Amino acid sequence: MKRLLGIDYGKKRVGVAVSDPLKIFASPLETVPTANIVNYLKNYTSENEVEMFVVGYPVNMDNKPSEAAQYVDIFLKQLKKAFPSVPVVLEDERFTSVLAFQSLIDSGVKKMDKAAVDKVSAALILQTYMDRKK
């Protein structure tokens, strides 16, 4: 069964999450250096069926794209070029890093790992999308 991939794009690192086959739960998968993300996704999709990419989109409280959106826009063009047959949807990523950080603290993580925050953020983005589509 095809799965959904959640993506939290950043200038240095990209968090990636995956849905379960029934698209009920999102799980953190990997944190990838930004320069390697398209190749990582090509490798992943060659071994796993992906139905859709759910990409976190940075917006301000006034619902306008944040400064970071320009980087996500460039990535979106690369993603659509590399995977023309895989749909891409955008999901509001406001507060996902804060929620991911709190989630890791609550789970007992002592030393904060930024890579862990990124992939947990990707899972939160993906879970939010799936919950909204139920």
Predicted regions and their residues:
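Phosphate- and other anionic-substrate recognition elements at nucleic-acid/protein interfaces
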Residues: 2-4, 11-12, 17-134
